[in-house]
Amino acid sequence: MTTPPLRPLLNWGLRRSLRAPRLAHTRCPADFGLAFISVRIPSTLDKSLHAWLIPAPASVPLPAPALVIVHGWGSNSDLMLPLAPALHAAGLTLLFIDTRCHGASDDDTFASLPRFAEDTVRAVDWLAARPDIDPGRIALLGHSVGAGAVLLAASWRPQTAAVVSLAAFAHPAEMMQRWMAEQDLPDAVIGPYILRYVQRTIGYRFDAIAPINTLPQLRCPVLLMHGEHDSVVPVADAYRLLAAAGTDKVQLHIGPGGHDSMEAFLAVIDRVSDFLAAQGIARNTGEGDTE
């Protein structure tokens, strides 16, 4: 058992090892031929978020539908940009956000799935207040931790129109256990302490924020997408999420590719557009214009 004098050192080491790496942007929407505006969005704790706002094509009547895109852990909005042209062509205003401690957003004491979700809700509220956006047609798309975050955000914000989840895990405790195994940490000895420490730090019990528990709470349609070769989050998690949902409002698509392959998700992006079109949010595939 960990003795009290060692706890501050252990806690410091845990906080340090779990800190999300910050990646700088190397490209922007203009690199994909899209006009955009860089904006700052107020979040919690007096922090602000960097975001790229890509207005819907001019042929889309206002107020326009919108999609908020949330990256994964240690990533940024730049890495989600390959999805932008196809989603924009589907008639959507796009908002790519950097969550706190990521990309060009403000730093904070730590990053966590709930803080990702808090930032997502603030971004949605910011969008919904714009006169050019239809507040009833705002959908969410997230990858990995960002996928867990958009599911959590939608459980907090029941008016969410739809959710697209890319490579979501079923339960954060299981992700932590996989991480501990990769670090060769003695799970039986120190594992329970680490799990308690992380939950105490983030202010939430893992059960309260686990996608397998938040997904069944959602009122809106959900599309789960997962790569069959995902070595970070087992594809079995996607099937567990579908089973937990227990409703035909939740769809699952298993495709090629691994965990971080935006190219693999891009190859089946029409499924996302068609799913959103079925909810009255996007245009059907093939209806886009050439601007």
Annotate each predicted stretch with a short phrase.
Residues F110-P131:
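Alpha/beta-hydrolase active-site loop
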Residues G72-A86, T99, D106-D108:
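The serine-hydrolase catalytic nucleophile loop
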Residues S231-D237:
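Conserved alpha/beta-hydrolase "acid-adjacent" motif
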Residues A243-D260:
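Catalytic histidine neighborhood in serine/cysteine hydrolases
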Residues M1-P42, W52:
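An N-terminal hydrophobic leader/cap segment in hydrolases
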Residues L152-Y204, L266:
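Hydrolase active-site cap/lid region
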Residues Q217-R219, L224-H226, D230:
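Short beta-strand/loop motif that positions the catalytic acidic residue
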Residues G257-I269:
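Catalytic histidine-centered segment of alpha/beta-hydrolase-like enzymes
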